[in-house]
From Swiss-Prot:
This is Serine/threonine transporter SstT. Its main location: membrane. It is found in: Cell inner membrane. Signal peptide: none annotated. HAMAP family: Ser_Thr_transp_SstT. The lineage of its organism: Bacteria, Pseudomonadati, Pseudomonadota, Gammaproteobacteria, Moraxellales.
Length: 400
């Protein structure tokens, strides 16, 4: 039996864990207090690895970033950044229009102070940026961690190849540890689902359904409205034939592999069939699999604002714009590990003074809905890589 279960994919295991958790909560509610330990251990494990994960992944990706010599690379990068920012803005609007409430253990947020004016937020942001790096990691100050990772990464871009390789090896090692933690996600999710449904009942299903609807609806909006607008402005023509071709031939594959990196060969093959210059595609598509994460920006923004709404924190427009920028920067590091966007939610939550403990509960909620969220997110991310690359190449041919 154990051997059969071990052969199942992580998605299948999570689905089974959710079904078992709901069943135990409804049929044997008195047992659920004993199952809470599984969920607590899982959240604790996520809390312990998240700070070093963010630091190492961002540092390594920036230090090893190679710009290349393709003239078409700069406009592709510009589309990547603009696309992620617009995706985050879309997520803000969707979250305001359809606010979601999460079921969280918020006992520890009694001392939580809502951010004041924009000046207070910027002041706290700047103070977080210049935190001691060791203290930032130990106290899970994700803004400080991000600042030091970016700074060191930029400085190490001029270091030797050996040093860069060491950082990449450390990044792979940390990712391997994360994979081990994620492997226990079904057990943790089983405990979390059982306790949540025992406490809140079937109303929890409605909460998760609305959260999923906001997430998936926003990603579809980005894929079918935002991206076509950007591509249409680039190629100065009807973008939809190219959009649908990329969604069909790249997005569907990425949906099932749930990995932008694994979808790189598919995208390179599609780019070749679209007649894209190989010198552009060979750089922009692997780079896109690393930094172009519009779906991750949506996930980080929606789940952060759902947390803010749940805790009753008032947020003004200026703060939401800052959140969109932070979500975009955070999303660039989401490719380091499967479900990486969820593990970067604490970075955005720290903007609002939300504790790491509560943020990790949100990560656990994300794990529960990740069966659909992560697949759709990857489909959007990966199909956008080849879409923007092809659009810039078409524009280049038009100008030549």
């Amino acid at each position: 039996m154990l051997e059969f279960f071990s052969r199942l994919s992580l998605v299948t295991k999570i689905i089974i864990a959710i079904i078992l958790g709901i069943g135990v909560a409804l049929l044997f509610p008195t047992v659920t207090p004993y199952l809470s330990l599984f969920g607590e251990l899982f959240i604790k494990a996520l809390k312990s690895v998240a700070p070093i994960l963010v630091f190492v992944l961002v540092l390594s990706s920036i230090a090893n970033f190679q710009v290349g010599h393709s003239a078409n690379l700069r406009p592709v990068l510009l589309l990547y950044v603009v696309g992620m920012l617009l995706a985050a803005f879309s997520a803000v609007i969707a979250s305001l229009s359809f606010p979601s409430t999460l079921y969280l253990n918020t006992v520890s947020h009694n001392n939580l102070q809502a951010p004041g004016s924009l000046a207070d937020i910027l002041k706290n942001l700047l103070l977080s940026f210049i935190a001691n790096p060791v203290q930032a990691i130990s106290e899970a100050n994700f803004i400080g961690i991000l600042a030091w990772a970016i700074g060191l990464g930029l400085a190490m871009r001029h270091s030797s190849d050996t040093t860069k390789q060491v950082m990449q090896d450390v990044s792979h090692a940390v990712s391997a540890i994360i994979h081990k933690v994620i492997a226990f996600a079904p057990v943790g999710i089983f405990g979390l689902v059982a306790v949540t449904f025992a406490d809140a009942g079937l109303a929890t299903l409605e909460s998760y359904a609305q959260l999923l609807a906001v997430l998936l609806g926003t990603m579809l909006f980005v894929a079918l409205v935002i991206n076509p607008i950007l591509v249409g402005l680039t190629i100065r023509g009807n973008p939809y034939p190219l959009v649908f071709k990329c969604l069909k031939e790249s997005g569907i594959t990425a949906f099932f592999t749930r990995s932008s990196a694994a979808n790189i060969p598919v995208n390179l093959d599609l780019a070749e069939r679209l007649g894209v210059n190989p010198s552009t595609a060979s750089v922009s598509i692997p780079l896109g699999a690393t930094v172009n994460m519009a779906g991750a920006a949506v996930t980080i923004t929606v789940l952060t604002l759902a947390t803010v709404h749940t805790l009753g924190i008032h947020v003004d427009l200026a703060t939401m714009i800052i959140l969109s920028i932070v979500a975009t920067i955070s999303a660039c590091g989401a490719s380091g590990v499967a479900g990486g966007s969820l593990l970067l939610i604490p970075v955005a939550c720290s903007l609002f003074g939300i504790s790491s403990e509560i943020a990790m509960q949100v990560v656990a909620v994300g794990m529960i809905i990740s069966v659909l969220q992560d697949s759709t997110e990857t489909a959007l991310n990966s199909s956008t890589d080849v879409l923007f690359t092809a659009a810039v190449d078409i524009r280049s041919r038009q100008n030549s």
